[in-house]
Each structure stands twice: as structure tokens, then as C-alpha cells.
Amino acid sequence: MITHEVERTLAELSSTGSSAKRICLVSWNGNPAKLDLRVWRTVDGETKPGKGVTLTDEEAETLLAALTDYFG
């Protein structure tokens, strides 16, 4: 069984109905938290992770550099 703990929500990018796309710091299976971009769904009052991507610090820094270059 995969476990998760959202340690901090950095931003909510969008939401529709019972789902929201968020950037969070998430610990998976008791490991150190990593940056996580994912859709979170609320089902029967419980928030569950949907499809997404987890990034190491190095990957997040590379993404930040690429976005900064793209947006100027």
C-alpha cells in the first residue's frame, strides 16, 4: 500500500468540481518530501492523489530555469 503525507501546499493551479491541480511537498511511503505536481480528488470527504509527477530538487531547479527562460 502506498502512503502519502502532504507536508505543505505551495500553490493551487486550478480546480474544477471535486478535483484540484496543486504543487505540494509530499512524502511518499515515509521518505523525505519532494516537490509534487498532481491532481488531487475529493471522494467521500477524503482527498486522494491522482495522476501527477514528483520532482527531485535538481529536477525542480532545471524546470524553474526552463520556465524562467521561456517566460523571460
Spell out what each predicted region is:
Residues 1-72:
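Positively charged, low-complexity terminal tracts
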